[in-house]
Amino acid sequence: MPLLLDICPRIWYNTAMQTDMEGLWRTVTAGETGEKFAAFYAMLTEANSRFNLTRITGEEECRVKHFLDSLAGMNYFPPNADCCEVGSGAGFPSVPLLIARGDLAFTLIESSQKKCRFLETVIKELGLRASVVCARAEEAAKGPLRERFDVCCARAVARLNTLAE
């Protein structure tokens, strides 16, 4: 009898990935972290009703496309890493990573004043180890932030070659 992997590797891979991510979700939402994810979702949807943070607002879609997507690489961050997120927007992937990995610290770089205020509120309310720099990445990179971080990340900000500059 052929294995599912032999017949359709993509279906097998997607099913295995989904199973792994569901397990991850159950693990990271136990106890206090689950409450923080719920609070972040509530803050996100409330703020999104006033100004555009994201088009993804449904609970299940947000869980999969924002939270789980943000957490997919969390085990690649070294312990106690000092991290930077360029173009933080609504806080993905930084906020889910900060909730799930309390050992991480983030500097969030965002150019929109409204989004910076939202991120500052989230950080304060959830007690996260993060700070917000309200500036364009090109400008922030010229100052004391340059080459300071263990890990830098970005999501849906720019083409990779532009971002790497």
Where are these regions (language model features)?
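Conserved SAM-binding loop of SAM-dependent methyltransferases across substrates and taxa
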Residues: A90-D103
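Class I SAM-dependent transferase core
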Residues: I7, W12, M17-N80, K114-R117, ...
